[in-house]
C-alpha cells in the first residue's frame, strides 16, 4: 500500500466548514408552519441551557444503590412485624445459617462424622421442631422466589 503524506494531498472543505462562525444563516421559509418551527428553534437557541445534574458511579456504588432500592421496596411491601411482648434481656439470638445443625462432642467417633457428611445439604433437609420454623435459615418458597427474582434483575443489569 502507498504511504499517505499530508503535504501531497490537499483536502477541499465545503463552504459551510470554512465560513466564519459569527455569520447568521438566512433561512428561507415558505410556509407559516415552517416559520413557526424556525421561530421556536431560534427561541430555544437563545435561552440559557437547562442545568442537569449528572452522577458518576463506579460499579460497586451502583450495586450498593440497587440493592438498597430493592431492600427499601421490600420493607415497604412487607413492614417488619413487631416482636411479641418479651423482655429484651430474654431475647435469644438465632444461630447463623452456616452453622451445622449437628453439634459434635469432644469424644465423638469418626463414624458419626462420616454420617454427617452423607446427610443432605442444610437448605434441603426438612425443618425439625418448632425452633426451626422460626429460623431465618428456613424460608418459605415464596420468599426465596421473590429474593431470587430481585437478584435476577440485579445480575441481568450489572453482569450482562
Swiss-Prot record:
InterPro entries: MRI (IPR028278). The gene is Cyren. This is Cell cycle regulator of non-homologous end joining. Residues 99-109 have a biased composition (Low complexity). The modification N-acetylmethionine is found at residue 1. Keywords: Acetylation, Chromosome, Cytoplasm, DNA damage, DNA repair, Nucleus. It is found in: Cytoplasm; Nucleus; Chromosome. Residues 78-152 are annotated as: Disordered. Pfam families: MRI (PF15325). A motif (XLM) lies at residues 150-160. GO terms for biological process: DNA damage response; double-strand break repair via nonhomologous end joining; immunoglobulin V(D)J recombination; negative regulation of double-strand break repair via nonhomologous end joining; positive regulation of double-strand break repair via nonhomologous end joining; protein homooligomerization; protein localization to site of double-strand break. GO terms for molecular function: damaged DNA binding; molecular adaptor activity. Cell-cycle-specific regulator of classical non-homologous end joining (NHEJ) of DNA double-strand break (DSB) repair, which can act both as an activator or inhibitor of NHEJ, depending on the cell cycle phase. Acts as a regulator of DNA repair pathway choice by specifically inhibiting classical NHEJ during the S and G2 phases, thereby promoting error-free repair by homologous recombination during cell cycle phases when sister chromatids are present. It comes from Rattus norvegicus.
Amino acid at each position: 500500500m502507498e504511504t499517505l503524506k499530508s503535504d501531497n494531498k490537499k483536502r477541499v472543505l465545503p463552504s459551510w466548514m470554512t465560513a466564519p462562525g459569527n455569520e447568521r444563516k438566512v433561512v428561507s421559509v415558505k410556509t407559516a408552519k415552517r416559520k413557526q418551527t424556525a421561530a421556536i428553534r431560534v427561541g430555544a437557541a437563545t435561552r440559557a441551557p437547562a442545568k442537569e445534574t449528572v452522577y458518576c458511579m463506579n460499579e460497586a456504588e451502583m450495586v450498593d444503590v440497587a440493592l438498597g432500592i430493592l431492600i427499601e421496596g421490600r420493607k415497604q411491601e412487607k413492614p417488619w412485624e413487631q416482636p411479641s411482648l418479651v423482655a429484651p434481656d430474654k431475647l435469644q439470638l438465632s444461630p447463623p445459617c452456616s452453622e451445622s445443625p449437628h453439634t459434635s462432642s469432644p469424644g465423638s467417633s469418626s463414624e458419626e462424622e462420616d454420617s454427617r457428611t452423607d446427610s443432605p445439604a442444610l437448605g434441603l433437609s426438612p425443618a425439625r421442631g418448632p425452633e426451626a420454623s422460626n429460623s431465618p435459615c428456613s424460608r418459605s418458597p415464596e420468599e426465596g422466589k421473590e429474593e431470587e427474582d430481585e437478584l435476577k434483575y440485579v445480575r441481568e443489569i450489572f453482569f450482562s
